[in-house]
């Protein structure tokens, strides 16, 4: 008997480095992103994902998503999160915070259980869709079910989906509370509670909802908070609901090192003309243009389209299905320019965006920080341009003081090395729907002066034709307004030989 066991042991071969190499070779890994990166993501301890001793199936999803090595926030967070300890993490926008909490959350899920084991809360619907997509992408080999639920969609659909096993629930606070209060979403055995953009979720409008949601969780839950900014209200939440949290602060400075910031001092009526000049001179791969109100979002999008540029718009008054369509198409490169309100300032990760323009300058440093963080994602280069009028000068000074940065006047010529990549093919894009047109990397990096006169869209997407921009609206999706009562802004110049009014009226 002993001899038989010894013989069996001799014939048993343990896994070695060569077998590990084989499973990596079989992975469908995307092309390497060869763009240079800043120290925001390269200043690591030298750890590999294998050093975290996570499941091979999870590592397969990580590598197939294009990850190579953990970023600083991932190095600090993942080992601690795997132990089940509460975490309070602060890091810059675009440095890998989402994967920092998704990876340990996926590792701790038991796919054989039908219970909901993790709740991830985010403040906006677009961020919920993006976060659920990350969960599904990284966990695609784990057999885990991920569900996203947000307001603006049918409640009955969510109830039907929750009849099946849902391991990770991603959503906005109001909708999740609605489902939990009705007894549809069972969080009684949900040990993981994550809040992304926690500073927003702990604002007065959300705090009562968050505290109610915590009451549905077991007392021995793990709470993880992630954000780029932490106001004082976070401390009161930590003292009340977290147990000896591990605090991570990678914010030695507030602004991303790869983002170059400029301001242009212009009169209100000259802003569109200035924007037109920027479009004609900059090499924009994709741009996001921010306004301070939903009315101005639509008005500016209409003006941009009349100038002959392709343009999407998005704001909170649109129907959710239209917002989803705009977000999906813009991520896939269908359009080059997106005009939006602060709806898309938080967490939205679109790697191809290299220019952010504040058409309306924000009122506070927090909003400014989140806006410009839409470019220069994951240590890459980006450009932020602020159009400043006389009333904005004090806000400009205040934001510079609070962020500890200096925003320079815009030069006559902007060095393309600050925001343009020599090889645009290296910019990763999501896999687009084959039925939808997609901008090639070469076209996306070409001069933005290219005009598109037959771009037909509605519900957040303008239709250009017969010398004017038009759109179809309806209740809740951005109604056409009485333009005579609008704040007027216009252009002092012409666009490529076309005649345009100097003011919107």
From Swiss-Prot:
One GO molecular-function entry: ATP hydrolysis activity
Subcellular location: Cytoplasm, P-body
UniProt KW Zinc-finger keyword: no
SUPFAM superfamilies: P-loop containing nucleoside triphosphate hydrolases
Entries under CDD domains matching the protein: DEADc_DDX6 (cd17940), SF2_C_DEAD (cd18787)
EC assignment: 3.6.4.13
Composition skew (Polar residues), residue ranges: 482-505
Motif DEAD box per record, residues: 196-199
One BP annotation, GO: regulation of translation
Binding positions (ATP): 91-98
Catalysed reaction equations from the record: ATP + H2O = ADP + phosphate + H(+)
UniProt main location, coarse: cytoplasm
Enzymatic class: hydrolase
Ranges annotated as biased composition (Gly residues): 466-477
Record keywords, A-Z: ATP-binding, Cytoplasm, Helicase, Hydrolase, mRNA processing, mRNA transport, Nucleotide-binding, RNA-binding, Translation regulation, Transport
Motif (Q motif): 47-75
Disordered, as annotated region: 450-505
Residue ranges of every copy of the Helicase ATP-binding domain listed in the record: 78-248
Any one GO CC term of the record: P-body
Function as written in the Swiss-Prot or TrEMBL entry: ATP-dependent RNA helicase involved in mRNA turnover, and more specifically in mRNA decapping. Is involved in G1/S DNA-damage checkpoint recovery, probably through the regulation of the translational status of a subset of mRNAs. May also have a role in translation and mRNA nuclear export.
Free-text note regarding domains: The Q motif is unique to and characteristic of the DEAD box family of RNA helicases and controls ATP binding and hydrolysis.
Protein known as: ATP-dependent RNA helicase dhh1
């Amino acid at each position: 008997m002993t001899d038989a066991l010894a013989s069996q042991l001799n014939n048993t071969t343990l896994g070695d480095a060569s077998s590990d190499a084989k499973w990596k070779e079989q992975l469908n890994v995307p092309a390497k992103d060869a763009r240079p990166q800043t120290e925001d993501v390269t200043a690591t301890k030298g750890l590999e994902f294998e050093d975290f001793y996570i499941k091979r199936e999870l590592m397969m999803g990580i590598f197939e998503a294009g990850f190579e090595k953990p970023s600083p926030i991932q190095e600090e967070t993942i080992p601690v999160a795997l132990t089940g300890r509460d975490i309070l993490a602060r890091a810059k926008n675009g440095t890998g915070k989402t994967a920092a909490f998704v990876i340990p959350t996926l590792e701790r899920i038991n796919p054989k259980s039908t219970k909901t084991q993790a709740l991830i809360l985010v403040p906006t619907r677009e961020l919920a869709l993006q976060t659920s997509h990350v969960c599904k992408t990284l966990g695609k080999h784990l057999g885990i079910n991920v569900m996203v639920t947000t307001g603006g969609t049918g409640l009955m659909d969510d109830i039907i989906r929750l009849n099946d096993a849902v391991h990770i629930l991603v959503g906005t606070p109001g909708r999740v509370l609605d489902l939990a209060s009705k007894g549809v979403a069972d969080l009684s055995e949900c040990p993981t509670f994550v809040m992304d953009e926690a500073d927003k979720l702990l604002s007065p409008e959300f705090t009562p909802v968050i505290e109610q949601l915590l009451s549905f969780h077991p007392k021995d839950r793990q709470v993880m908070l992630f954000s780029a900014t932490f106001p004082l209200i976070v401390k009161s939440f930590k003292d009340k609901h977290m147990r000896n949290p591990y605090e991570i602060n990678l914010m030695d400075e507030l602004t991303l090192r790869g983002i170059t910031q400029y301001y242009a001092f212009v009169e209100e009526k000259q802003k569109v003309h200035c924007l037109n000049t920027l479009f004609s001179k900059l090499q924009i791969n994709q741009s996001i243009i921010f306004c301070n109100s939903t009315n101005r979002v639509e008005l500016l999008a209409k003006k941009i389209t009349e100038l002959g540029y392709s343009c999407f718009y998005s704001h909170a008054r649109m129907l959710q299905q239209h917002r989803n369509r705009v977000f999906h198409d813009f991520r896939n490169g269908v359009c080059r320019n997106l005009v939006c309100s602060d709806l898309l300032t938080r967490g939205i990760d679109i790697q191809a965006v290299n220019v952010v323009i504040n058409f309306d300058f924000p009122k506070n440093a927090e909003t400014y920080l989140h806006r410009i963080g839409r470019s220069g994602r994951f240590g890459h280069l980006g450009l932020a341009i602020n159009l400043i009028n006389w009333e904005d000068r004090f806000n400009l000074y205040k934001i510079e003081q609070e962020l500890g940065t200096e925003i320079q006047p815009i030069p006559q010529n902007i060095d393309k090395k600050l925001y343009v990549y020599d090889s645009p093919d290296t910019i990763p894009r999501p896999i687009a729907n084959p039925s939808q047109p997609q901008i090639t990397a070469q076209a996306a990096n070409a001069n933005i002066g290219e005009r598109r006169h037959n771009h037909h869209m509605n519900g957040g997407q303008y239709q250009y034709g017969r010398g004017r921009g038009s759109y179809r609206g309806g209740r809740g999706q951005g109604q056409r307004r009485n333009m005579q009562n609008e704040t007027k802004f216009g252009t002092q110049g012409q666009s490529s030989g076309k005649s345009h009014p100097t003011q919107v009226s």
